[in-house]
Amino acid sequence: MKTRISWIFYCLVSFMLLPSLSAAERFVTNESNGFTWIQQGKAYPILVDLQEDKGVLRAVANLQTDAGKVTGATPEIIHSPSGNRMLIIGSVENSSWIKQLMQAGKIPAADLKGKREKYILQTVKQPVEGVEEAIVIAGSDKRGTIYGIYELSRQMGVSPWYFWADVPVEKHDIISIKDRKSTR
């Protein structure tokens, strides 16, 4: 009997700790620190390669819509650099922008090459000519890139259950991304 109670207690504690082990590091803040992507109704654009997989392009379009729902500001999706700050999103497989950043040593190739379903999100200073700073979401493959995009949406305040269960979107005036590298 004592063994059974110990076993039940062990199982309950394990199930309570399990969600905290899988939770992604919090990289989005609603204060004006780090890389401020959206503030006062203005958003920096999202740069994505047209050669990117259709699933990634759809996730980028969803991110654009989600940003509008959260802040009221809808970022523009662009295919060549424009302006001094932006989000750069792509996979190692298909994005010329991500390949260029890896070749220049601005994002670590070792974190992505040969990996499956992995992404990094990090701030990069002067990622391409004419751009002062960017947040880069780079995936090892299509799924990794999509995971990174939807993790950003989730941390902004859009529940994965928004579409299916009508979970309300958290409204914020500011979306900032902390100056650090996040991987998953």
Regions found by a protein language model. Give the residues of each.
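Positively charged n-region of N-terminal signal peptides that target proteins for export
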Residues: 1-7
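Contiguous, structured surface segment used for ligand recognition
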Residues: 23-182
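Accessible peptide chain termini
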Residues: 1, 182-184
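Bacterial N-terminal signal peptides
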Residues: 8-20
